[in-house]
Amino acid sequence: MEQCSRSSRGTALKVESIDWARWQPEEIATLMFVIKNNQVLLIRKKRGLGAGKINGPGGRLEAGETPEECAIRETNEELIINPLKVRPAGELFFHAEDMPRIHGHVFVATDYEGIPSETDEAIPIWYSVDDIPFDEMWEDDRYWLKQVLEGSSVRGYFTFVEERLLDHEVTFFQDSCFNPVT
């Protein structure tokens, strides 16, 4: 079963105007969302891209690392926990004139080892999956995160200028239908 949601704002940087087949990311990154007892573990980012925003832990892929290995490593570095029962949950493609172009891999974990702890990179915060603070997050999150936390997988294309979402195209999949691009 596939559902599609689409919205557009502005006249520049429409998702449909980009040749995504030839598009190349400048960075490959990951996000991890740990879910336990109908709550999701998010972070308030303390530094780097998105500092001050709430998001899932994650970061840039290192040489020789798979996206899943990166997501687990970054979660451990940012929260001092090891995510368990990890599943791929989507891919996000971000195009911006004033920020790096990013191909993001999304993962969900339904268990973890350790105690979520503040680090120099992040402050851990638990939220009910029904009360996610979208107003404090990247603008694109409101178009896909809730569905991913409810078990769908996502492929999303987003265009930004000055950290403002201009356009997006999002498709949701049941897990058995989702095949990552890379």
Indicate where each model-derived feature is located.
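A positional/architectural concept
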Residues: A51-K53
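Unchanged
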Residues: L61-L84, F93-V148, E169-T182
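Short, charged/polar surface micro-motifs in flexible loops or helix N-caps
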Residues: I35-Q39, T110-I115, G151-S152
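Conserved N-terminal beta-strand and adjoining loop/helix that marks the start
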Residues: V15-L41, R60
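A structural microfeature
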Residues: L42, G90-F93
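Short Pro/Gly-enriched beta-strand edge/turn motifs at strand-loop
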Residues: G10-I18, A89
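Intrinsically disordered, low-complexity segments enriched in serine/proline and basic residues
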Residues: C4-S5
